[in-house]
Regions:
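Extracytoplasmic small-molecule ligand-binding "clamshell" domains
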Residues: 1-50
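Ligand-binding cleft/hinge of the Venus flytrap
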Residues: 2-3, 16-26, 103-126, 156-158
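Extended ligand-binding regions for polar small-molecule ligands
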Residues: 13-22, 94, 101, 177-214
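Short helix-initiation/N-cap motifs at beta->coil->alpha
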Residues: 28-40, 82-83, 122-135, 171-173
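A ligand-binding cleft/hinge motif common to bilobed small-molecule-binding domains
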Residues: 53-60, 108-109, 139-171
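Periplasmic-binding protein-like
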Residues: 70-77, 157-195, 213-227
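Flexible hinge/capping segments at coil-to-helix
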Residues: 78-95
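Ligand-binding clefts/hinges and TM-proximal coupling segments of bilobed small-molecule sensing domains
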Residues: 105-124, 164-165, 195-227
Length: 227
């Protein structure tokens, strides 16, 4: 999100504009919406949803998904890890996540396991905006954040290193563009346009601007098989 708090920015915004251009459309309108509300609004309020959606069997039952990235999860902490956060033992800590993401689910599962092991639960703090999370991590309100590895990398760059990745990337999974299942024509157009961006290096170029070029896939699959 830009400094005005209203204008969406990031590689998904740039990819969305590139898809529209390939499809011969005007640039179109990119609107910000709370993460959990995007998929239910496809086909009514929105034509396409592109917001780091991890492809899951549950989402593929709701909408068509066209893959374009393979992204893992990563821990982010303030520079120097002042809270001494231990990725191998997050029990009893306060962790920020973006609402509705795979990381929110994963953090809740970790917390449940902590309690089952007789340890203190994790305080999982959902937020709509990653920028809000970054501010609270830097100020010391939270111990760590859990997000897409590409998000952690971008946040680190934007914060000039005030937030850094801690540990290795894990739980890699494909992400996709979401389209209403009833709109087969738009689905096919998005898949073809995404493949064009891949084949001609445009997708990698866009991602490189955010340090995320290694996440690019080479085949835009429709509803790929996932666990």
């Amino acid at each position: 999100m830009a400094s005005d708090g209203q204008t969406p920015i990031g590689y998904d915004v740039d990819i969305n504009k590139a898809l529209a251009k390939v499809m011969g459309l005007k640039e179109g309108t990119t609107k910000h919406s709370e993460f959990p509300t995007i998929i239910p609004a496809l086909g009514t309020k929105f034509d396409v949803g592109i917001s780091s959606f991890t492809i899951t069997p549950e989402r593929e039952q709701q909408v068509n998904m066209v893959s374009y990235l393979n992204v893992g999860s990563a821990w982010g902490v303030a520079q120097g890890n002042p809270k001494n956060f231990d990725t191998s033992n997050p029990c009893g800590t306060t962790i920020a996540v973006q609402t509705g993401t795979a990381q929110e689910t994963y953090a809740e599962e970790l917390s449940t396991q902590c309690v089952a092991d007789g340890k203190e639960k994790i305080s999982v703090m959902p937020h709509e905006l990653q920028t809000d999370i970054a501010t609270k991590i830097i100020s010391g309100q939270y111990d760590a954040t859990l997000a897409d590895s590409t998000v952690i990398g971008y946040t680190s760059a934007q914060s000039e290193g005030k937030i850094v990745q801690l540990g290795e990337t894990f739980e890699s999974a494909p992400q996709g563009v979401a389209i209403n299942k009833d709109d087969e024509e738009l689905t096919q157009a998005i898949q073809a346009a995404m493949q064009y961006l891949m084949d001609n290096g445009y997708l990698a170029d866009i991602l490189a601007s955010y340090g995320a070029q290694d996440a690019a896939l080479t085949t835009a699959e429709l509803n790929p098989t996932v666990n």
